[in-house]
Amino acid sequence: MGHKVNPVGMRLQINRTWDSRWYADTKDYGDLLLEDIKIREFIKEECKQAGVARVIIERPHKKCRVTIHTARPGVIIGKKGADIEVLRKKIASMTDSELHLNIVEVRKPELDAQLVGESIAQQLERRVSFRRAMKRAVQNAMRMGALGIRVNVAGRLGGAEIARTEWYREGRVPLHTLRADIDYAHSEASTPYGIIGIKVWIFKGEIMEHDPQARDRKAQELQDGPAPRGAGGNRRGDR
């Protein structure tokens, strides 16, 4: 079963949580959900060159907090913050709530499945060999500390008449293990021969805590390093 379902959805409420974090009454739910979709699609199109990995939307009371995880924050922020102000105004016009926009840097894009998939897609659109693009992505991920990675590409590879699927894997990718921290994403490359689909699974280790926020905390530690410990071995802020 682990090979049939989305690894992200399968692990929700076990060791990871949703990218949309809010509650609404039945009468407002549809409108807010549509608003989320429009905001995500707009950011994906507007910040295409910035390498957007995730967009997290939270809605505390009468507010809308949008957090963009990106590999190139400077592209979004712009010179002296000019570009981010333009982006903030455009997103604010799409919602009636008070908008708060945050930018978070992804310091290891080689370990983010979405960014890896988009990188492969861009290479395929530039007519780079699909085998070379896949192998480069796998080698970079393993070099940066991944315990395993699998990449699938499907379509008219190399302009072939008949579509086929090719995959490349290195290390372990235990899809059946629910405590496994597996990042998954899919992308598409638009080529002269048609659309090529790309799927990426990256295994980063195991999360022993049964906590939806555990994966986010682990990702933050990988970015910033473990929090300093005080006397008694406790991390500062744990008390």
UniProtKB/Swiss-Prot annotation:
Short name of any one Pfam family annotated for the protein: Ribosomal_S3_C
Asked if the Swiss-Prot or TrEMBL record annotates the protein with the keyword rRNA-binding, the reply is yes
Start and end residues of each stretch annotated as Disordered: 212-239
User: GO cellular-component terms in the record?
Assistant: cytosolic small ribosomal subunit
KW Ribosomal protein (keyword) present: yes
Any one biological process term the GO annotation gives = translation
Q: What GO molecular functions are on record for this protein? A: mRNA binding; rRNA binding; structural constituent of ribosome
Q: Which CDD domains match?
A: KH-II_30S_S3
**Boundaries of each KH type-2 domain copy?**
39-107
Composition bias (Basic and acidic residues) maps to 212-221
**What UniProt keywords are attached to this protein's entry?**
Ribonucleoprotein, Ribosomal protein, RNA-binding, rRNA-binding
Ranges of Gly residues composition bias in the record: 230-239
The protein's role, per its UniProt record: Binds the lower part of the 30S subunit head. Binds mRNA in the 70S ribosome, positioning it for translation.
Subunit structure and binding partners: Part of the 30S ribosomal subunit. Forms a tight complex with proteins S10 and S14.
The UniProt entry's sequence similarity note says: Belongs to the universal ribosomal protein uS3 family.
- In Swiss-Prot or TrEMBL terms, this protein is called Small ribosomal subunit protein uS3
Species annotation: Ruegeria sp. (strain TM1040)
The gene that this protein is the product of is rpsC
